Curated annotation (Swiss-Prot):
InterPro entries: PPIase_dom_sf (IPR046357), PPIase_FKBP_dom (IPR001179), Trig_fac (IPR005215), Trigger_fac_C (IPR008880), Trigger_fac_C_sf (IPR037041), Trigger_fac_ribosome-bd_bac (IPR008881), Trigger_fac_ribosome-bd_sf (IPR036611), Trigger_fact/SurA_dom_sf (IPR027304). It is found in: Cytoplasm. Involved in protein export. Acts as a chaperone by maintaining the newly synthesized protein in an open conformation. Functions as a peptidyl-prolyl cis-trans isomerase. Keywords: Cell cycle, Cell division, Chaperone, Cytoplasm, Isomerase, Rotamase. The keyword Cytoplasm applies. Consists of 3 domains; the N-terminus binds the ribosome, the middle domain has PPIase activity, while the C-terminus has intrinsic chaperone activity on its own. GO terms for cellular component: cytoplasm. It holds the Pfam family Trigger_N. It catalyses: [protein]-peptidylproline (omega=180) = [protein]-peptidylproline (omega=0). This is Trigger factor. GO terms for biological process: 'de novo' cotranslational protein folding; cell division; chaperone-mediated protein folding; protein transport; protein unfolding.
Length: 444
C-alpha cells in the first residue's frame, strides 16, 4: 500500500492511498470460497455449489463488500502509517479502480498543533473582595426574610408589602384572555408584573378601587398584547406588611446554633459560609478572565468534528438540566430541532479552543495535579455539610468523583501558571457586586 499526504488546512490532511489489485483479488477469492460453503441455491446441496455459480450469482456484491472493507481498513492503516493524530471520521473521496491498484483520496481532520504565545502579553483583571460586618448582617436579615410572615395592615400599600386584589384588564374597552384574576397575591417591588402595574397599586388601601393605565412591553411574550396600551381595574382586598421572625432560640435552632451560643455563633457560621462563597467566586472569576485572555491572544483553528462533539455534549447537558427541573416527561418532548447547533456553536468553539490551549500549556509546563490541593479543595467543600467526614470519605472512595475534582484543581494550577507571568490588575469589589457577577455568568 502506498500513501502520500498533503495538508488541506491547519486541521485537515488529504491522504492519497493506492492499494494493490492483488490484495483485493486475494480477499475476493477467499470470501467467494467462504460464501460457497454456506450459500443456498436451488438445485445444489449446501456446500456443493460450484465456484463459477457463486461468482455469477454473488460475485458483484461480494466484490463491492471487499472493496468497501479494504477502503475502510486501509484508510486507518494509512493514518497510523503517516502518524496522523486524527479526529472524527475520515471522508472518502474519488475512488478509482485502475488495472493494478485501487486508488482513493481520504480527507481527515487532525488534532491542532499549536504554539501558545508567552503569557507576559496577557492582561488579566483579578477581583478581590472581603466580607464586612454589614454583609453578614444583610445575610442574616435575608435568612429572616426567607421565614417571614405577613401581618394585615390598614395602612397604604408600600414596596415590599403583600397585596391581595382583583384585577380586570381591557384594551380599547375590550377584555382579553388572561387579563383578569381574583384574590391575586403580589409582593410590591417583586417585578412580576409589567412596568407600571405595581407602581399603580402603591398607595392604595384595602377596600379601594382604581383604574391604572399601562403599556405592554414591545417584546411581551403574547404577541397580540405586545406594545399595546391597556387599562386595569384594581380592587384591593387586603394589604399585609412583612413580619420578620425574632432571632430567638427557635430561630437559632434552625441553623444548628444553641441559645447559649447565640447570635455571635450564627454570625460566625454565616461569615464562614460567605467567605467560602467568595473564595469560590473569586477563583471562578479569575479563571474565566485568564482563560478569556488566553483564547483571545491565541487565534487557532479547530476541527469541525471536535466542535460538533462539543455541541452534542452541551445539548445533552441542557436536556439533562431540563429533565431535572421538569421531569422525564418534559425531556421526552424535546427534539433536536428545538435545540439547533447554532444555539451552542459559539460557546462550543470557544470551549474546544480553550481545551486545546490548556492541554498545550499543561504539556509545555509539565504540570501534574497537586493531590494536596485536591484534598484541600474537598475539605473546603465538605465543611459546608453537616457531616464533613462522610463527604471526604465519599470522594476518597469514588475514583470518578475525585477525578472530576482533580480536573478542576488542574485548571486552577494552569491559571496560577498563567498569572505568574501575565499582567495582573487587582480590582476590589463588594460582596454584593461579586454575587451579581456570578449570577450573570451563570445565566449567560
Amino acid at each position: 500500500m502506498q500513501v502520500t499526504t498533503e495538508a488541506v488546512s491547519g486541521v485537515a490532511r488529504r491522504l492519497n492511498v493506492s492499494v494493490p489489485t492483488s490484495r483485493i483479488n486475494e480477499q475476493f477469492e477467499a470470501r467467494l470460497k467462504r460464501t460457497a460453503k454456506t450459500v443456498k441455491i436451488n438445485g445444489f446441496r449446501p456446500g456443493k455449489v460450484p465456484a463459477n455459480v457463486v461468482r455469477r450469482e454473488y460475485g458483484a456484491s461480494i466484490y463491492q463488500e471487499v472493496v468497501n472493507d479494504i477502503i475502510r481498513d486501509s484508510v486507518f492503516e494509512a493514518i497510523q502509517q503517516e502518524k496522523i493524530n486524527a479526529v472524527g471520521t475520515p471522508n472518502i473521496e474519488k475512488v478509482e479502480h485502475k488495472e493494478d491498484a485501487l486508488v482513493f483520496e481520504a480527507t481527515v481532520e487532525v488534532y491542532p498543533e499549536v504554539e501558545v504565545k508567552a503569557f507576559d502579553g496577557l492582561e488579566v483583571e483579578r477581583k478581590t473582595a472581603e466580607i464586612k460586618d454589614a454583609d453578614v448582617d444583610t445575610m442574616i436579615e435575608n435568612l429572616q426574610k426567607q421565614r417571614q410572615t405577613w401581618a394585615v395592615t390598614k395602612g397604604m400599600a408600600k414596596k415590599d408589602m403583600q397585596v391581595t386584589f382583583d384585577f380586570e384588564g381591557s384594551i380599547d374597552g375590550e377584555k382579553f384572555e388572561g387579563g383578569s384574576a381574583e384574590d391575586f397575591k403580589l409582593v410590591l417591588g417583586s417585578g412580576r408584573m409589567i412596568p407600571g402595574f405595581e407602581d399603580g397599586i402603591i398607595g392604595m388601601k384595602a377596600g379601594e378601587e382604581k383604574v391604572i393605565d399601562v403599556t405592554f412591553p414591545e417584546d411581551y411574550q403574547a404577541e397580540n398584547l405586545a406594545g399595546k396600551a391597556a387599562q386595569f381595574k384594581i380592587t384591593v382586598k387586603q394589604v399585609e406588611k412583612p413580619k420578620l421572625p425574632e432571632i430567638d432560640a427557635e430561630f437559632l435552632k434552625i441553623f444548628g446554633v444553641s441559645e447559649e451560643e447565640g447570635i455571635e455563633k450564627l454570625k460566625a457560621d454565616v461569615r464562614k459560609n460567605m467567605e467560602r462563597e467568595v473564595r469560590n467566586g473569586l477563583r471562578n472569576q479569575v479563571k474565566q478572565a485568564a482563560f478569556d485572555a488566553l483564547v483571545a491572544a491565541n487565534e487557532i483553528e479547530v476541527p469541525a468534528a471536535m466542535v460538533a462533539q462539543e455541541i452534542d455534549r452541551q445539548r445533552q447537558q441542557m436536556v439533562q438540566q431540563f429533565t431535572q427541573q421538569f421531569g422525564g416527561a418534559g425531556a421526552q418532548s424535546f427534539d433536536k430541532s428545538m435545540l439547533p447547533d447554532e444555539l451552542f456553536k459559539e460557546q462550543a468553539e470557544r470551549s474546544v479552543k480553550l481545551g486545546v490551549l490548556v492541554s498545550k500549556v499543561l504539556a509545555d509546563a509539565k504540570l501534574e495535579v497537586d493531590q494536596a490541593r485536591v484534598d484541600a479543595y474537598i475539605d473546603d467543600m465538605a465543611s459546608s455539610y453537616e457531616d464533613p467526614t462522610e463527604v471526604i470519605e465519599y470522594f476518597k472512595n469514588d475514583a470518578q468523583q475525585r477525578a472530576q475534582i482533580e480536573a478542576v484543581v488542574l485548571e486552577d494550577q494552569v491559571v496560577d501558571h498563567i498569572l505568574a507571568s501575565a499582567k495582573v490588575t487587582d480590582k476590589a469589589v463588594s460582596y454584593e457586586d461579586l454575587l451579581k457577577e456570578q449570577q450573570a455568568r451563570r445565566m449567560g
